[in-house]
């Protein structure tokens, strides 16, 4: 993820208020907002109180909500995700940020069609977009392995959310996002937002360029 040197950031302690598990290894951590202002698409750096290990997470919640949320996948070799999984309401997080320039420009909000392409927990900033900007024209393509990785898909308009599963059948598309996109009709008013692993972003960007989408209409955020 890129840091935006123009961001106004701070470090503070925020109390955890809730944790909800979406699968065995993916959960949403909710904590006090503490007055933090952010733009949907930005990320914060999170770690436990008095712990040196920290990690970047896109904000999952909407900009008008009175709390902050992050979507976390437990990674076996990831110290921070393992620590966060063991948190309980009442524990404190050290939060630094926000950072980054990834997001939807205000002048594009209702004048463009927004195509969100995510892999795994890369859905996080798009969840924030949809929560923050009711009424925008959007379509989500969410690439996952299994159907149970369609994290809180009920929060999206079912006519606008398409699940692409690589390991099992899906009501939408069986196969990776990159298998479906070549047949997707591109229109001149579309902006493409990519968020997820580096391989997905590289392959999707290549597909879009082959479809004559200008580079300035492809916005990317790499998850690692």
Stretches found by the model and what they are:
Residues 8, 79-224:
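FNR/FR-type flavoprotein reductase catalytic core
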Residues 2-91, 96:
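Ferredoxin-reductase
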């Amino acid at each position: 993820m890129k840091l935006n040197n123009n961001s106004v950031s701070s470090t503070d302690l925020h109390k955890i208020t809730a944790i909800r598990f979406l699968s065995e290894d993916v959960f949403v951590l909710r904590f006090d907002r503490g007055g933090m202002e952010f733009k949907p698409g930005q990320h914060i750096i999170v770690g436990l109180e008095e712990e040196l290990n920290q990690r970047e997470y896109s904000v999952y919640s909407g900009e008008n909500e009175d709390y902050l949320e992050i979507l976390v996948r437990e990674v076996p070799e990831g110290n921070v995700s393992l620590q966060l999984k063991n948190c309980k309401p009442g524990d404190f997080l050290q939060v630094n940020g926000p950072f980054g320039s990834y997001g939807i420009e205000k002048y594009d909000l209702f004048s463009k069609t927004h195509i969100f392409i995510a892999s795994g927990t890369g859905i996080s900033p798009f969840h924030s977009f949809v929560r923050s900007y009711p009424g925008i024209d959007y379509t989500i393509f969410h690439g996952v392995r299994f159907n149970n990785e369609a994290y809180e898909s009920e929060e999206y308009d079912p006519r606008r959310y398409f699940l692409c599963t690589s390991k099992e059948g899906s009501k939408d598309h069986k196969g990776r996002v990159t298998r479906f996109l070549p047949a997707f009709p591109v229109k001149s008013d579309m902006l493409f937002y990519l968020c997820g692993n580096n391989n997905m972003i590289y392959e999707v960007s290549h597909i879009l360029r082959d479809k004559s989408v200008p580079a300035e209409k492809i916005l990317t955020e790499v998850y690692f």
